[in-house]
């Protein structure tokens, strides 16, 4: 071994308490820097003492919480949190003592993994040599007993060490009656930390060494990694200097790199003693190996940098080192040594030195950094829990001691004032309903009067075809609907918004005044996120003009057909545009029935019956009016009554009016006539739905006020319940609070002291330069 690593077998003495052990760190650190393996045991001892004190503090706090009555200022969640912390500490302490430094050796079959392990242990612990092949995982760890033994992973029964060569040897003919060992099974080898041949420094310092089958025996590496490698601190790849790095070896470590974050990997190029026979190309071969190893560690695995990689690759002969160490101890007479063995021995010692520093630093960080962080978290949770309980206790005591009478008076006044507020609210809502009714009704009829101006703003090319006319009416209805809805919303919202807002604000201000100051924030939270009120108005013009039938054929104002349509519209109580324009044609009944096919059967039948009666009357009148006999009869009667001059003048005036209207009938007149018919029809329909519209707006305003009132009432109800509960608690718990506050303050001081110990532990063991790199 390296001369720079002096053997230290015992831990420095420490006191019973954790802080006394921490004070001794300054004296022991200088020795620990020279013996990195010792730092792991020191850190384990110090952190274990911290956890012991933390366990006592949590147990004391649990006892205090149990003495406090249920539903007091310690909630059930806070009790459960402390109990969970206590359970976590027990679990961590159970596993804490089993934490150790673990190194796993991998490589192809017969590359010298077992020989390398024996060389590091200074003793032939594992079977090795020609013809021996490890068939399973062999885990070597220290035993406090004087005699070593074997133990299967799933069986606690001890097995004699003499059976190791048979059980772990894949090629042995004498293990037919022994337990079958699969390649991923584990055989534990418990070797005495102090044996007759001396003390094993690695095993003395809690280093666990894992030997593996050859990676070329099975491509199923995932089960190997999951079972045996996830807790490893260092991986050592034992390669053969007489061959290059194989894909099987690469694949294994690529799998490891995927499952572990940046594993620590060393590469031992074993059997470098073979280079003694080939001195000519030895440097070229070494450079070739170095290049491939660097590329694998830096570029492919990405586990170290270019600067670090030189301390991860070593060219050694494990056989030479083992036999040399056995000879030094007098266990063999002659040691195998080839030319250059001294350089290779120094290289092996250099590997051991870097390995010990690496595994110590890695194990402390991987095993203890998480424990240290977890202890910080648990102490932090305990302190937050304590602070919360102490704050609640102090507030409770202050309220119970000084504000009991004041709280009772405030509670009673709040209840009386809210009852008065509820009565006033009912009166205000009825007044608001009347105001909304007047305002909305007036605005609605004003919009009806403005229909001419709204319709005149509609500009779209007029198409007299059937499809064009349908599209024109649909677009006109949509345009008018948007204008009416937006105008009515603006009128109603603008006129009534200030009134509604002022009323809501008055409600909020009144309720704020009747609540005590500590509870006013609850009301502000409800009020802050409330959206402003706005009327939602939908006139739905397309639905109102659904029965609109335009009449764009030229019809003389004083013609018989026009007069009859006006009479029918008056008698039926409908706009004249709701009367079909083709009443005088027999085909109109069929067309009307097809248009209204979506209506129910009864309405369709009634419409057909009415249309048939109208058809009969109008057809009879038309035949009578158009027949020559009718003309002669009527003409004779009029002639006898008024004379021919009056008839001539009347006929001329009638003909003149007819000619004047006929001359003015063009596309523009048709469009204007259509808009006028549309306006007249829509105005009549809007007057019919004005009452429903007004009621709808009233409902919206009252609903808005009810929502505000319900929110205020729910908030005040919650405040009343809290005030009542506070009064009940204040009457019974003053003395208990005083005693609890004193006890909790003592526990809190202990928690602060433990935090300082953890910070000192992190500074001594977990900082980036601890232990220093060799």
From Swiss-Prot:
Q: Which residues lie on this side of the membrane: Mitochondrial intermembrane?
A: 639-640
The knockout outcome noted for this protein's gene is: RNAi-mediated knockdown results in fragmented mitochondria, most likely due to lack of fusion activity. RNAi-mediated knockdown in a moma-1 mutant background results in mitochondrial fragmentation. In a drp-1 mutant background, partially restores some tubular mitochondria. Upon acute heat stress, in a drp-1 mutant background, autophagosomes clustered at mitochondria are detected in the epidermis.
Instruction: List the SUPFAM superfamilies.
Output: Fzo-like conserved region (SSF111479), P-loop containing nucleoside triphosphate hydrolases (SSF52540)
Catalytic reaction equation(s): GTP + H2O = GDP + phosphate + H(+)
Q: Where are the transmembrane segments?
A: 618-638, 641-661
Q: Where in the cell is it found?
A: Mitochondrion outer membrane
Annotated region (G5 motif) at: 300
Its annotated function is as follows:
Probable transmembrane GTPase. Mediates mitochondrial fusion. Fusion of mitochondria occurs in many cell types and constitutes an important step in mitochondria morphology, which is balanced between fusion and fission. Dispensable for normal apoptotic processes during embryonic development.
Protein name as annotated: Transmembrane GTPase fzo-1
Organism this protein belongs to = Caenorhabditis elegans
Its taxonomic path starts at: Eukaryota, Metazoa, Ecdysozoa, Nematoda, Chromadorea
């Amino acid at each position: 071994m390296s001369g720079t690593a002096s053997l230290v077998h015992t831990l420095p003495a420490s006191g019973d308490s954790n802080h006394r052990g921490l004070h001794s760190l300054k004296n022991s650190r200088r020795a620990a820097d020279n013996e990195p393996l010792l730092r792991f045991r020191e850190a384990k001892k110090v952190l274990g003492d911290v956890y012991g004190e933390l366990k006592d503090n949590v147990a004391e706090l649990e006892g205090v919480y149990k003495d406090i009555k249920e539903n007091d200022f310690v909630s059930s969640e806070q009790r459960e949190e402390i109990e969970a912390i206590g359970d976590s500490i027990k679990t961590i302490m159970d596993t804490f003592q089993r934490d150790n430094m673990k190194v796993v050796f991998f490589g192809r079959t017969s590359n010298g993994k077992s020989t390398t392990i024996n060389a590091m242990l200074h003793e032939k612990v594992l079977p090795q040599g020609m013809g021996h092949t490890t068939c399973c995982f062999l885990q070597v760890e220290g035993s406090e007993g004087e005699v070593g033994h074997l133990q299967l992973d799933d069986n606690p029964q001890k097995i004699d060490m003499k059976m190791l060569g048979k059980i772990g040897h894949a090629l042995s003919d004498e293990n037919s009656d022994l337990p079958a060992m699969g390649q991923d099974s584990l055989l534990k080898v418990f070797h005495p930390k102090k044996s007759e041949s001396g003390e094993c420094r690695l095993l003395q310092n809690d280093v666990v060494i894992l030997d593996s089958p050859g990676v070329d025996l099975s491509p199923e590496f995932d089960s190997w990694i999951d079972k045996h490698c996830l807790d490893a601190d260092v991986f050592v790849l034992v390669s053969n200097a007489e061959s290059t790095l194989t894909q099987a070896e690469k694949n294994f470590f690529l799998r490891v790199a995927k499952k572990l974050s940046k594993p620590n990997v060393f590469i031992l190029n074993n059997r470098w003693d073979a280079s003694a026979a080939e001195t000519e190309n030895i440097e070229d071969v070494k450079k070739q190996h170095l290049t491939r190893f660097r590329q694998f560690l830096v570029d492919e695995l990405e586990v170290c940098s270019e600067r670090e990689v030189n301390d991860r690759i070593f060219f050694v002969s494990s056989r030479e080192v083992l036999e040399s160490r056995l000879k030094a101890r007098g266990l063999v007479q002659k040691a195998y040594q080839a030319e250059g063995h001294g350089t290779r021995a120094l290289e092996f010692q250099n590997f051991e030195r870097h390995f010990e520093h690496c595994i110590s630093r890695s194990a402390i960080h991987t095993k203890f950094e998480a424990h240290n962080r977890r202890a910080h978290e648990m102490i932090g949770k305990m302190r937050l829990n304590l602070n919360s309980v102490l704050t609640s206790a102090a507030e409770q005591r202050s309220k119970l001691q000084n504000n009991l009478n004041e709280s009772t008076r405030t509670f009673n006044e709040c209840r009386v004032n809210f009852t008065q507020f509820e009565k006033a609210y009912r009166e205000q809502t009825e007044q608001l309903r009347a105001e909304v009714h007047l305002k909305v009704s007036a605005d609605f009829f004003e919009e009806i009067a403005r229909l001419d101006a709204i319709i005149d703003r509609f500009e779209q090319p007029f198409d007299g075809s059937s499809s064009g006319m349908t599209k024109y009416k649909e677009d006109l209805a949509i345009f008018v609907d948007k204008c009416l809805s937006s105008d009515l919303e603006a009128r109603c919202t603008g006129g009534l918004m200030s009134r509604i807002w002022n009323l809501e604000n008055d409600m909020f201000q009144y309720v704020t005044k009747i609540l005590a100051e500590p509870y006013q924030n609850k009301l502000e939270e409800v009020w802050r996120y409330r959206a402003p009120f706005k009327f939602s108005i939908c006139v739905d013009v397309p639905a109102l003009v659904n029965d609109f039938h335009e009449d764009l054929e030229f019809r003389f104002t004083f013609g018989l057909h026009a007069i009859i349509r006006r009479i029918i519209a008056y008698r039926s109580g409908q706009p004249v545009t709701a009367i079909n324009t083709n009443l005088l044609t027999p085909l109109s009944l069929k067309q009307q029935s097809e248009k209204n096919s979506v209506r129910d059967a009864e309405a369709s039948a009634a419409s057909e019956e009415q249309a048939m009666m109208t058809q009969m009357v109008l057809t009879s009148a038309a035949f009578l009016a158009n027949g020559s006999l009718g003309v002669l009869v009527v003409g004779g009667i009029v002639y006898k009554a008024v004379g021919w001059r009056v008839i001539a003048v009347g006929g001329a005036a009638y003909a003149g009016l007819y000619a004047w209207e006929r001359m003015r009938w063009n596309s523009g007149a048709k469009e204007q006539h259509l808009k006028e018919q549309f306006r007249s029809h829509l105005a009549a329909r809007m007057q019919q739905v004005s009452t429903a519209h007004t009621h709808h707006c009233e409902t919206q305003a009252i609903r808005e006020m009810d929502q505000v009132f319900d929110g205020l009432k729910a908030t005040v109800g919650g405040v009343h319940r809290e005030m009542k509960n506070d009064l009940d608690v204040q009457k019974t718990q003053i003395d208990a609070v005083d005693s609890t506050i004193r006890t909790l303050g003592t526990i809190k001081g202990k928690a602060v002291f433990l935090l300082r110990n953890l910070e000192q532990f992190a500074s001594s063991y977990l900082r980036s330069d601890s232990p220093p790199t060799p």
